[in-house]
Amino acid sequence: MFANNVMFDYSKEPSRDILCIDCKSFYASVEAVERGLDPLTTKLVVMSYYDEAGGQSRGSGLILASSPAAKKAFNISNVTRARDLPYPYPDDLVIAQPRMRVYMEKNQEINRIYKSYVDEANHHVFSVDESFLDVTDSFKLFKVSSAYEMAQKIQKDVYDQTGIYTTIGIGDNPFLAKVALDIGAKKEGDMIAEWRYEDVPDTLWQIADLTEVCGIGHRMARRLKGMGINNVYDLAHSSYYVLKDKLGVMGAQLYAHSWGVDRSFLGTPYTTKDKSIGNSQVLPRDYTDKDEIAVVVKEMADQIGTRLRRAGAQTQVVGLGLGYSMGYFDTSGKRGIHKQVKVTPTNQSKVIAEVALYLLSLLYDDQVIRHISLYSGNLVYHQAIQLNLFESENNQVADMKTDVIVDTIRKKYGFKSLVYASSLKAGGRAIDRSSLVGGHAGGMAGIEGEAHG
């Protein structure tokens, strides 16, 4: 240990009872339960572009989710190619087409169970299959004596009501709960792991692969290894001041995390005051490629344009928000960043996309992105069309006509019947995730009757 290094007094750090709950192989589990099958023992994959009525025809898309048994039997992971499966397909392999709306409905059902244990302020949805709960103040109400007992109770409730298995990490703070889930829970027979401050030397410091820790990507791991830091123990016993000097606020945060310290609290999400129409996506993985992020932003702009036109509205403000991966902080110590600009009233998808991509160029600087939000605000509702004085009148009218044609086709044949070619690129979400409901995975929120803002 370095002389005069920063030390932490756990007695002065936040100590709550935080649960990080993950629905095990969520999409695949939902499909198994819908078929009356066991989610753990059934070999099942969710595959895009697979014709279930086509017998042994080979799928050509992505494997979006795999059951635990399928992963083990075929040595595959989530988000692999159809060609990675043995062909002809084994008789005991179940292949399901993705049904995002079904998954979102099941997600909402499960989150209602969570909310029966905690209030809104103590419930945070991290992704479609993962949530944080602060159950510190819920023990007496549910007549339990520990966070572990509470976790067992919630786990049983979710399974009894939905048939979905959950894994749970318990910690004094969100970070410890998250790493307990990611690393500890999957090794336990009851799929629950509890990591407390006093357990750090025997749990957190035993992690050999830095990239297993949320907030440390491969690029950061390489930088740390260049500094002689090869595992979490090395990180905890390195110089705080050297880390801070070389990596800025991120270095300070990594040092704190290596000691299991996280001073963040669960809270309610930010909502804009002005009436707005927007979309918010929790991405299926960390995005670090600007081009991939741009594809998603453009898709979301297209969705918002459609929703504005359906509502008979025009926006005077376009805003973009980028949320970072769990545990990631930028050089300013922030967990996310957002920016908005005023625009001439519009509901044209092309204009909204151009503004959104401009905002992306201002905001993105190699951060690790897990959440994207795009919104339109200060809406005006009237029949008159306001043209931009600095652009060709003919071009603007032509773009409006194009939007009307696109809307007509999508209304009849579905949103993904007509999408940008860029949606076929890596990172695209509009096709494989064709129903953006509740802020995750798709592209139809507000277009087929929903109004998620």
Model-based region annotation:
Residues 30, 334-453:
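Acidic, metal-coordinating catalytic segment for phosphate/diphosphate chemistry
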Residues 133-155, 225-228:
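Catalytic palm subdomain of template-directed nucleic-acid polymerases
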Residues 128-135, 172-177:
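Short, conserved phosphate-binding/catalytic loop or strand-edge motifs used
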Residues 8-13, 20, 212, 222-366:
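DNA-contacting surface of Y-family translesion DNA polymerases
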Residues 150-209:
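Long, highly charged, low-complexity intrinsically disordered interaction regions
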Residues 1-128, 132:
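Residues that scaffold, gate, or flank divalent-cation-dependent active/transport sites
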Residues 128-131, 314-329, 375-384:
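Core structural elements
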